[in-house]
Amino acid sequence: MKILVLGCNGMAGHMISLYFTENGHDVTGFARNKSRFINTITGDARDVGLLKGIVRAGKYDAVINAIGILNSFAEDNKSTASFLNGYLPHFLADVTADMDTQVVHMSTDCVFSGKDGGYSEQSVPDGNTFYDRSKALGELNDGKNLTLRNSIIGPDIKQSGIGLLNWFMQQKGPVVNGYTGAIWTGQTTLQLAKTMENAIANHAHGLINAVPNSSITKYELLKLFNKYLRGSSLEINPVNGVCADKSLIRTNFDLNYNIPDYETMISELAEWMKIYKELYPHYDIQ
């Protein structure tokens, strides 16, 4: 398949780009800076003329949108967040409306507040922050394009990344606190790439909560990180702290693909990270 990955240097984007390339697909990246491992077109995604020309000329099987303005940055840069999180996915859908190219968009559990939990594809987003609302605005739900809604965990090629795994891998210990009241559903970035590959090949479309059949606490997640990536060298201390249940429930099975359990996903991610260890010199992978 011929794939364009927007945001190919980000936490999700670099993994998606590398996975698709390693599995024989023709991958082009788009980012502000050149990727170290795939052919990259550099530019600003806010330059709609440039982006439209790239998408139209490339005649890709899929455009994967891995661009996102996150959390506090979205609060401080509302116009940029509105454009990239909310407008861009719909712009891409419009640009490709008369083409065979599918837009695959990444959404997040953060479109929900976490007050209730067990959110399905039919649940009405009730996130409180500007980031939450901008991501909800960007979700595509039509008969051609695909939105995969889930949280993600994975390595970051940037030491300054704000993801949970990036934070954990830089902890010196010996004790790390894990929240028992923070309920999570999602995928590793490696598994997300696999899910996308299957979805594109099988023309899945609409809005899909792309999660396993169960949830997990952040405390249990850290225990798995510790086991597979730090040689159980840290003590993970259970704490109450943050209580939020943004768990997702999948009811749309247009994507006929089962996402593995959390331990399987994290063990596979750990093996991948050990193979590509040179990408993550800021991690002490054991």
Where are the predicted features?
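NAD(P)-dependent short-chain dehydrogenase/reductase
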Residues: 128, 140-191
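Glycine-rich NAD(P)-binding loop of the Rossmann-fold in SDR/ketoreductase-type enzymes
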Residues: 76, 80-91, 125, 129, ...
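NAD(P)H-binding glycine-rich loop region in Rossmannoid oxidoreductase-like domains
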Residues: 44-86
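Mid/C-terminal beta-alpha module of Rossmann-like enzyme folds, strongest
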Residues: 193-245, 277-286
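Amphipathic terminal alpha-helices
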Residues: 260-286
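N-terminal Rossmann-fold cofactor-binding loop
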Residues: 29-35, 44-45
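N-terminal Rossmann NAD(P)H-binding glycine-rich loop of SDR-like oxidoreductase domains
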Residues: 3-23
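Conserved Rossmann-fold NAD(P)-dependent oxidoreductase catalytic core, especially the SDR/UDP-sugar
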Residues: 90-126
